[in-house]
């Protein structure tokens, strides 16, 4: 089962909405089962509060999301890159859902050194991003912040990922064929 995590406030007319519709159509055409978490439509609360640390269950209100992640074979993230990073709502989702004990863990080994456990190993992900500027600007400014999700967070939890970047989306009304081909390849 695939789990789509969509993080854009406009799920009808935005470039990200076009990507979402395309991904849904491809998964349906290929007979794939999928669920969608639309963070803005669900009014996901991205804020960690002190109470989350004060009770043994911690992040009880995100257990359903954790169950969805646990059940999924593949995660498909669709979001714009704003100021070279993911939207705040998605960062909050990652921080509240991909928690210690669920997505990763640390213990002390026999040698007294920390041992890192990737608890979501075996899962895959596709990260699809839109950018308002061209690839040249992205490369010039650096890619590290925009790639935090796949290169750091997902890998840290044991999830292997593929990435599709759609540059210079401003003024483009439809999903270009070259981007559709890249998405198809990532979903294959």
Task: Please name every model-derived segment.
Residues 1, 33-35, 123-125, 160-161:
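Residues at the starts of beta-strands that form the adenosine-phosphate
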Residues 1-32, 40:
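N-terminal beta1-alpha1 ligand-phosphate binding loop
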Residues 23-31, 98, 151-160:
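Short helix-loop-beta junction
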Residues 57-147:
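Helix-loop-strand module that forms the ligand-binding subsite of alpha/beta enzymes
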Residues 136-188:
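Glycine-rich phosphate/pyrophosphate-binding loop and the adjoining helix
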């Amino acid at each position: 089962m695939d789990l789509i995590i969509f993080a854009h406030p406009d799920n009808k007319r935005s470039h990200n909405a076009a990507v979402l519709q395309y991904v849904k159509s491809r998964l349906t055409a290929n007979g794939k089962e999928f669920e969608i978490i639309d963070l803005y439509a669900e009014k996901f609360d991205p804020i960690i509060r002190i109470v989350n640390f004060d009770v043994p269950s911690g992040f009880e209100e995100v257990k359903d999301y954790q169950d969805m992640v646990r059940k999924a074979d593949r995660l498909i993230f669709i979001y714009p890159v704003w100021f070279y990073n993911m939207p705040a709502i998605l960062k909050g989702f990652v921080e509240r859902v991909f928690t210690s004990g669920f997505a990763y863990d640390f213990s002390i080994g026999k040698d007294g050194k920390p041992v890192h456990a990737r608890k979501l190993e075996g899962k895959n992900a596709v990260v699809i991003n839109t950018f308002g500027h061209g690839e040249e600007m992205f490369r010039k400014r650096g890619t590290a912040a925009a790639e935090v999700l796949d290169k750091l967070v997902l890998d840290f939890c044991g999830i292997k990922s593929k990435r599709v970047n759609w540059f210079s989306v401003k003024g483009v009304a439809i999903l270009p064929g070259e981007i559709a081909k890249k998405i198809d390849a990532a979903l294959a």
